[in-house]
Amino acid sequence: MEQFHGTTIVSVRRGDKVALGGDGQVTLGNIVMKGGAKKVRRIYNGKVMVGFAGGTADAFSLLDRFEAKLEKHQGNLTRAAVELAKDWRTDRMLRRLEAMLIAADATTTLVITGNGDVLDPEGGICAIGSGGAYAQAAAKALADNTELSPREIVEKSLEIAGDMCIYTNHNRVIETIE
């Protein structure tokens, strides 16, 4: 059975502002199944933004578990991510899940990988998914050479990734915390 896959999620933090965005394409093999999926959401009473890439069912399963960890740890993003990563590494079912998450709140951005790693991105910029490398390179160039806001950088980075990656489209969802 082929997996649903392919997306681009990118986050940019600049000063006290952070933006997280993703495209809307869901692909099964070489077929576009949906063009308007929402892979970026707000959780924990709107205080945390999450974007996911990978197998759709796997990503939703991880998102549910992450939200439960946030509730358990009163919104402490780092603690919730580390606890999810611990579960991911020790639970046999979770280890089979093929997904990645970017989570951001007012002060912290984290990447939670399919290996159960929790990464604090360097320079406040990170991206995941099939178009992640394109989006991250574009975001870094824009952040280093312009005064654009995080939202504008995310928007332009997703546009560039959508032009280059066949698994990324131009239907974007972007959330911000200021």
From Swiss-Prot:
<dbReference type="InterPro" id="IPR022281">
    <property type="entry name" value="ATP-dep_Prtase_HsIV_su"/>
</dbReference>
<comment type="function">
    <text>Protease subunit of a proteasome-like degradation complex believed to be a general protein degrading machinery.</text>
</comment>
<keyword id="KW-0915">Sodium</keyword>
<keyword id="KW-0479">Metal-binding</keyword>
<dbReference type="GO" id="GO:0004298">
    <property type="term" value="F:threonine-type endopeptidase activity"/>
</dbReference>
<keyword id="KW-0645">Protease</keyword>
<dbReference type="InterPro" id="IPR001353">
    <property type="entry name" value="Proteasome_sua/b"/>
</dbReference>
<feature type="active site">
    <location>
        <position position="7"/>
    </location>
</feature>
<keyword id="KW-0021">Allosteric enzyme</keyword>
<keyword id="KW-0378">Hydrolase</keyword>
<comment type="similarity">
    <text>Belongs to the peptidase T1B family. HslV subfamily.</text>
</comment>
<keyword id="KW-0963">Cytoplasm</keyword>
<dbReference type="GO" id="GO:0005839">
    <property type="term" value="C:proteasome core complex"/>
</dbReference>
<feature type="binding site">
    <location>
        <position position="168"/>
    </location>
    <ligand>
        <name>Na(+)</name>
    </ligand>
</feature>
<keyword id="KW-0888">Threonine protease</keyword>
<feature type="binding site">
    <location>
        <position position="162"/>
    </location>
    <ligand>
        <name>Na(+)</name>
    </ligand>
</feature>
<dbReference type="GO" id="GO:0009376">
    <property type="term" value="C:HslUV protease complex"/>
</dbReference>
<dbReference type="InterPro" id="IPR029055">
    <property type="entry name" value="Ntn_hydrolases_N"/>
</dbReference>
<comment type="subunit">
    <text>A double ring-shaped homohexamer of HslV is capped on each side by a ring-shaped HslU homohexamer. The assembly of the HslU/HslV complex is dependent on binding of ATP.</text>
</comment>
<protein>
    <recommendedName>
        <fullName>ATP-dependent protease subunit HslV</fullName>
        <ecNumber>3.4.25.2</ecNumber>
    </recommendedName>
</protein>
<dbReference type="GO" id="GO:0051603">
    <property type="term" value="P:proteolysis involved in protein catabolic process"/>
</dbReference>
<feature type="binding site">
    <location>
        <position position="165"/>
    </location>
    <ligand>
        <name>Na(+)</name>
    </ligand>
</feature>
<dbReference type="GO" id="GO:0046872">
    <property type="term" value="F:metal ion binding"/>
</dbReference>
<dbReference type="Pfam" id="PF00227">
    <property type="entry name" value="Proteasome"/>
</dbReference>
<dbReference type="InterPro" id="IPR023333">
    <property type="entry name" value="Proteasome_suB-type"/>
</dbReference>
